[in-house]
Amino acid sequence: MPESTIPALLGRYRPQHVIGRGGEASIFKATDELLGREVAIKLYRSGGEEEMAQYRTEQAALARLSHHGIVSLIDAGIDYTAPKDPRPFLIMELVSGTDLAATLAQRELTVEEIAEVAYDISEALEYVHANGVVHRDIKPSNIMLVSYGTTTFRARARLTDFGIASGIRNAPATPEDGKTTGTAAYLSPEQALRRPATPASDIYSLGLVLLECFTRSVAYPGDAVESAMARLDHEPPVPGDLPGEWTRILHAMTASDPAARPTAKQLTPAFREAVIAAAGLQPKA
């Protein structure tokens, strides 16, 4: 069905225009006609088996998670306008800003901004992991830098896209035969080996994201196979001249052994101190 002919979903959410596209879904800016507010619609392109599995996984994950570091789920359903091609959708809060990938393509981040991203996402992952969920696809394009439209509040990093999360009822704990979970450039070594992802896998991926924030280059470039296999051969090159404790922290986050990586609970206070140090402030007594 042409996107321009999509009706109001659930009788109240009317799509306006596309604001993003992914491999399985399009994101629309839309109007909640009942409450008179703007929302986002994630509309899957088909109701095939793979799309339905991702829809169910993301719906279940977001329904049980409520945190300021995660883009919130409002509603969900299936569009039966074309009976032979039903399409699942998620109604989510509409956030103003850009994703981290687009920001890195445009400009260099300050150390303070990197520390803020690290703190925000680590805090979100601390909550996610405490609830038994593993994201499995931490990457710059899944981190939104949300603007509040005022100079009083800084942009906040928020985590999106739980379509392949694990720890959800009926979501596979291990990859299907011949498949990996996640995006090649940001996979943990255990994901590259098609082993189950754990909270430590998310920490590794976040470490690669933060390293990219400093270097503005992908640690493991190349095609999917080349990129995935490179991390089994060597750990990522972390510059030795990063400010403060950054070199040590990034080495720890990207350790080959999952057991050697810090947890999100351990990282969150460290990143809070990094924000304070970068801002030139002193912690309160």
Kindly label every feature range from the protein language model.
Residues P15-G22, I27:
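Protein kinase glycine-rich loop
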Residues R45-R64:
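AlphaC helix of the eukaryotic protein kinase fold
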Residues A76-G77:
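Activation-segment/catalytic-loop signature of the eukaryotic protein kinase fold
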Residues P83-D99, T103:
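Conserved short submotifs of the Hanks-type protein kinase catalytic core
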Residues V117-A118:
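Activation segment signature within eukaryotic-like protein kinase domains
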Residues S122-V133:
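Protein kinase catalytic-loop region centered on the HRD/HxD motif
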Residues D202:
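Conserved catalytic-loop aspartate of Hanks-type protein kinases
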